[in-house]
């Protein structure tokens, strides 16, 4: 910071004293209607926000760089700074400037950080905003990772004896901030993306004894067993670190957190961060959100709570059949009734973010606009309920189950209706209390409706009709006192007064008190005039004070309803989640899959939902796929661009959707529940950690081989391509063998490869089955049929794909020559060996005698450019040629032969 002159004003002394306690935060210092920043903070903020940088006291010894933002618009500016990774300390005036003796007292009331914000301006409505804490006990070889969304009060965590697993979850949950004990480094394997790591003192944040007390106090429990934390000291420490950090930044103990619920991994399908990225669940491979992701396809939610529940279910699909089938029942019920579903969508569209609204109200951070949003949301609850209830008969009665025959509510919905709470008492209170368009700030007044509070009504009447009340009093005195010439006046010295001429002053009644004598007039006051004047002068201030007190009382009353509000918010979130799945299924022609506890996966005419949406359903080619005990590992071959990766990804996505309880993009599907989905798809590297593409590939492969079980689903694409041909093929081969040996019968695997030699494993290793993406050669071109068919591909067609990609003709031609040369060399080398080695890969067995003869009599490689006629002959498909086409082609060749002969001569 700039070294200031010793001569400081009281204001700067106060500023620097406060700033000293928050050296790592930008200090927003409240001065009237602005927040001002000084010195280095001002220069940083002006640069990041692109606002004017000025100077306070430019002619004094202490020249302080300064910038400022209006109080009423501060949220937007803070949001920009938080997105850039800055911390912001809010320093408020904690006493009324009118009552201050000297400098107004100020103090930091909260510290805003990326992981602790609760205002809508700083949050994505449909995404959780997590603060995380990771702790590892080296002595016990155990650790924990916990996370909390302060804006909703939800928090959870997990305990593990595997440090790598904890870091995987930290990457998957992607907290905005991750708390670590001081001295702990991020491992090389962890890629945290936009997550900021915050080192905090272990003794103050991760201490077990004080942390246990902190957790029990925050949760209002006498022991840890009710929270699922008994016997998990590392998880207690991680939770305690979260609470300590929140108390430090929020300047208050947060009692709004929901009961802690440890994540039960046994109930959920586990999808790690790598697989989420490879399947493009939330972000495209280029890191962007929006079109091109599964989230973009599935998100037809209308409420922020429903959107966050969808995100949660995509992160943690079910592993148990019961919740999957319950979800399917509701989705199917809504899927079949378009009218009811649209009515439900219309009603839900009126609901705001009840979870975050109730949090801000509970923490006294809500604005009047938040209460209006809550009122509108509560008012929509009866309409939402009505969409679920059976339609009434003209007589006003409801039909019985027998009469509706098939219209019976699924159990989750009937249970929901039996516990439904319209919160009518609070909706009515908010309707009676608040105006339709209250000001943004409580202190501006104009919050409450007439009739809500008698004292406020009187003050409002005075403020609005004060002049009329004065004229009424004047008219009354003129009549009662018999003084028709009595006048009413006002000046700043004496205030309001009655005035009479000197001649008429002798006849004033006794209750008139003389205030001033002028040359031609006398001025008087009365008790009633003084009382009315006092009311008028103080009416505005008293009104604002009373409105603020009423608002705080209203806030306290509404805050008591938070458990009821959160209960209904959870119901609405589930309704929104279910209708979103039903709406997506109806729009895209998806079907309800059969989800079972076996291991078979059967998909008929499966589609990739994202690719289909991008290309259009008319051009997308669906595919069948079957995995059972005889087909545990499918080896998929075919050229690049043929669609191997699409088949791999769509299979994993269909399984994920099925275990969410959603419908799937297929004509028919039967899915054996998986415990984990693993993927190794596409090229990636981690240059920051010095890890090459091949190293990352091998690390991910190693993790799959260590963690996959018989119930897992593994998709592997091009294992071994990042190294030499024989190294890569050997590794791919060994991985296939290992996958078929593991878990007592092999792991369900889709394995795409260009190493055609590996396809010889079918028939040699039980469970291995060859499939390929069909193509067709036509008039020298290749046509991608995108169809998955049995058997291995006959060749890779890599050079043809290069030609289609626009590689120069000379390069393609030369590649063909080199390929032919390499193939002849390989065949000749095979002919020199008399017997195969025992270690020769089955796919590399020696050629037959006839193949050896063919090799011997093959012509030597040409040194020049290959004749165009030879290219045409080799590329022709005689099976699909008519006699007329053959004659036409021969004529063309004859002309071509003559042209080339003339060129040579």
From Swiss-Prot:
Domain of life per record: Bacteria
For region Disordered, the annotated ranges are 389-410, 826-847
Has the keyword DNA damage been applied to this entry?
Answer: yes
Q: What GO terms fall under cellular component here?
A: cytosol
In this chain, composition skew of type Polar residues spans 831-840
Task: Recall the GO molecular function terms of this protein's record.
Answer: ATP binding; ATP-dependent DNA damage sensor activity; damaged DNA binding; mismatched DNA binding
- Which InterPro entries does UniProt cross-reference here? DNA_mismatch_repair_MutS, DNA_mismatch_repair_MutS-lik_N, DNA_mismatch_repair_MutS/MSH, DNA_mismatch_repair_MutS_C, DNA_mismatch_repair_MutS_clamp, DNA_mismatch_repair_MutS_core, DNA_mismatch_repair_MutS_N, DNA_mismatch_repair_MutS_sf
Which residues of the sequence carry a binding annotation for ATP? Answer: 638-645
Q: Where is the signal peptide?
A: none
Could you confirm whether the keyword DNA repair appears in this record?
A: yes
Q: Which UniProt keywords apply?
A: ATP-binding, DNA damage, DNA repair, DNA-binding, Nucleotide-binding
Q: Which NCBIfam families match?
A: mutS1, PRK05399.1
**Function (record text):** This protein is involved in the repair of mismatches in DNA. It is possible that it carries out the mismatch recognition step. This protein has a weak ATPase activity.
**PANTHER family assigned to the protein according to its UniProt record, in alphabetical order:** DNA MISMATCH REPAIR PROTEIN MSH1, MITOCHONDRIAL (PTHR11361:SF34), DNA MISMATCH REPAIR PROTEIN MUTS FAMILY MEMBER (PTHR11361)
Under which name does UniProt file this protein? DNA mismatch repair protein MutS
User: What is the organism lineage in this UniProt record?
Assistant: Bacteria, Pseudomonadati, Thermodesulfobacteriota, Desulfovibrionia, Desulfovibrionales
């Amino acid at each position: 910071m700039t070294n200031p002159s010793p001569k400081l004003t009281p204001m700067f002394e106060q500023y620097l004293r406060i700033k000293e306690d928050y050296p790592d935060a930008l200090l927003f210092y409240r001065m009237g209607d602005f927040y001002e920043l000084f010195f280095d903070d001002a220069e940083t903020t002006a640069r990041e926000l692109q606002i004017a940088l000025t100077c306070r006291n430019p002619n004094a010894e202490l020249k302080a760089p300064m910038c400022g933002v209006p109080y009423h618009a501060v949220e937007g500016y803070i949001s920009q700074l938080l997105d850039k990774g800055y911390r912001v300390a809010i320093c408020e005036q904690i006493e009324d400037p009118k009552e201050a003796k000297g400098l107004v007292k100020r103090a930091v009331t909260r510290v805003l950080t990326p992981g602790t914000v609760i205002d809508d301006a700083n949050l994505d409505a449909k995404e959780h905003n997590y603060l995380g804490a990771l702790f590892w006990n080296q002595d016990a070889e155990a650790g924990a990772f916990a996370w909390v969304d302060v804006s909703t009060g939800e928090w959870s965590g997990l305990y593990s004896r595997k440090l790598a697993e904890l870091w995987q979850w930290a990457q998957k949950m992607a907290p905005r901030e991750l708390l670590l004990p001081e001295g702990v480094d991020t491992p090389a394997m962890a890629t945290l993306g936009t997550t900021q790591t915050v080192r905090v003192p272990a003794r103050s944040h991760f201490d077990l004894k004080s942390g246990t007390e902190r957790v029990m106090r925050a949760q209002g429990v006498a022991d840890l067993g009710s929270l699922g934390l008994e016997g998990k000291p590392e998880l207690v420490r991680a939770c305690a670190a979260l609470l300590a950090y929140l108390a430090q930044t929020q300047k208050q103990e947060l009692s709004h957190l929901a009961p802690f619920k440890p994540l039960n991994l046994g109930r959920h399908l586990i999808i790690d961060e790598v697989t989420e990225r490879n399947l493009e669940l939330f972000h495209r491979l280029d890191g962007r959100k929006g079109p091109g992701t599964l989230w973009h396809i599935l998100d037809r939610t209308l409420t922020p709570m429903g959107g966050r529940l969808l995100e949660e279910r995509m992160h943690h699909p079910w592993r148990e059949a019961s919740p999957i089938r319950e979800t399917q029942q509701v989705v199917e019920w809504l899927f079949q009734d378009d009218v009811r579903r649209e009515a439900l969508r219309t009603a839900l569209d009126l609901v705001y973010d009840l979870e975050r609204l109730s949090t801000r109200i509970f923490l006294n951070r809500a604005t009047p606009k938040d209460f209006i949003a809550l009122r509108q949301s509560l008012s929509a609850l009866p309409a939402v309920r009505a969409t679920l209830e059976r339609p009434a008969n003209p007589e006003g009665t409801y039909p019985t189950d027998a009469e509706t025959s098939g219209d019976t509510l699924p159990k989750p919905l009937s249970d929901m209706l039996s516990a439904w709470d319209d919160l009518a008492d609070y909706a009515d209170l908010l309707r009676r209390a608040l105006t339709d368009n209250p000001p943004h700030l409580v202190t501006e007044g104009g919050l409450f409706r007439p009739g809500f509070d008698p004292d406020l009504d009187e003050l409002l009447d005075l403020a609005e009709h004060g002049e009329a009340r004065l004229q009424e009093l004047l008219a009354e005195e003129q009549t009662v006192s018999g003084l028709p010439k009595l006048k009413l006046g006002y000046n700043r010295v004496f205030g309001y007064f009655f005035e009479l001429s000197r001649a008429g002053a002798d006849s004033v009644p006794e209750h008139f008190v003389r205030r001033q004598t002028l040359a031609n007039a006398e001025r008087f006051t009365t008790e009633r005039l003084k009382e009315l004047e006092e009311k008028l002068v103080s009416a505005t201030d008293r009104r604002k004070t009373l409105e603020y007190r009423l608002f705080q009382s209203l806030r306290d009353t509404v805050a008591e309803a938070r458990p009821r509000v959160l209960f209904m918010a959870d119901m609405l979130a589930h309704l929104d989640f279910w209708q979103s799945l039903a709406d997506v299924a109806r729009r895209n022609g998806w079907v309800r899959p059969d989800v079972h506890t076996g291991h078979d996966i059967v998909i008929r005419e499966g589609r990739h939902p994202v690719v289909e949406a991008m290309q259009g359903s008319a051009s997308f080619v669906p595919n069948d796929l079957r995995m059972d005990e005889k087909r545990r590992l499918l080896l998929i071959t075919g050229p690049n661009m043929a669609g191997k990766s699409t088949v791999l990804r769509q299979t994993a996505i269909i399984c994920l959707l099925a275990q969410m309880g959603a419908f799937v993009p297929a004509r028919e599907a039967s899915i054996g529940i998986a415990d984990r989905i693993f993927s190794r798809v596409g090229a990636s590297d981690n240059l920051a950690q010095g890890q090459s593409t091949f190293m990352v590939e091998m690390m991910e492969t190693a993790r799959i081989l260590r963690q996959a079980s018989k119930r897992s689903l593994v998709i592997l694409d091009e294992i071994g391509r990042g190294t030499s041909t024989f190294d890569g093929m050997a590794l791919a081969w060994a991985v296939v063998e290992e996958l078929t040996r593991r878990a007592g019968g092999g792991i369900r695997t889709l394995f795409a490869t260009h190493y055609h030699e590996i396809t010889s494993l079918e028939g040699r290793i039980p469970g291995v089955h060859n499939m390929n993406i069909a193509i067709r050669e036509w008039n020298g071109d290749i046509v991608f049929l995108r169809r998955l068919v049995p058997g291995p591909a006959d060749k890779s067609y890599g050079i043809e794909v290069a030609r289609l990609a626009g590689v120069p003709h000379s390069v393609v031609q030369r590649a063909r020559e080199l390929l032919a040369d390499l193939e002849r060399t390989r065949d000749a080398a095979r002919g020199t060996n008399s017997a195969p080695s025992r270690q020769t890969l089955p796919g590399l067995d020696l050629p037959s005698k006839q193949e050896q003869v063919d090799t011997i009599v093959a012509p030597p490689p040409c040194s020049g450019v290959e004749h165009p006629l030879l290219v045409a002959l080799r590329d022709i498909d005689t099976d699909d040629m008519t006699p007329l086409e053959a004659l036409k082609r021969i004529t063309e060749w004859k002309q071509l032969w003559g042209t080339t002969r003339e060129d040579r001569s």
